[in-house]
Regions:
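Conserved nucleotide-cofactor-binding alpha/beta core module
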Residues: 1-112
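Core SAM-dependent methyltransferase catalytic element
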Residues: 98-132
């Protein structure tokens, strides 16, 4: 699951690596443009773009083996960690609006193992699971 489709660049890279991607974008125009671009590039069969509040993931389709968030949250959203499969990984920038740390969360049964992987700056994650 990718949260924050944007231009579709990250989804295209993942598709080129052989991944099937479901991506959620909150801005309808970005979602439409990205889906068209991905189809034009030959990734339309590997990437599905949906419009919605990606900050809450897609709980109806969980569990996910991997959730990649392309926007920063103030904290790791439990609504996303709850959707991880056993052994699943969540990568998300966490912190203040203009200064974050890239965080990896791995589900190990009922436990979550969290590690930080350096500073970064992403746009804010807007929605119920992020900045409101």
């Amino acid at each position: 699951l990718e949260v924050g489709t944007g231009s579709g660049y990250q989804a295209a890279v993942l598709a080129a690596m052989g991944c099937r991607v479901t991506s959620v974008e909150r801005i309808p125009e970005l979602a439409t443009t990205a889906q068209e671009r991905l189809a034009r590039l030959g990734y339309g069969d590997r990437v599905e773009v949906r419009v919605g509040d990606g900050s809450t993931g897609l709980p109806g389709e969980a569990p996910w083996p991997f959730i990649l968030v392309a926007a920063a949250a103030p904290d790791v959203p439990a609504v996303l960690t709850d959707q991880l499969a056993d052994g699943g990984r969540l990568v998300i920038p966490v912190g203040r609006r203009y200064e974050q740390v890239l965080v990896l969360v791995v589900r190990e049964g009922a436990a979550l193992r969290t590690s930080s992987h350096g500073g970064c700056v992403f746009v804010p994650l807007i929605g119920e699971g992020g900045w409101r």
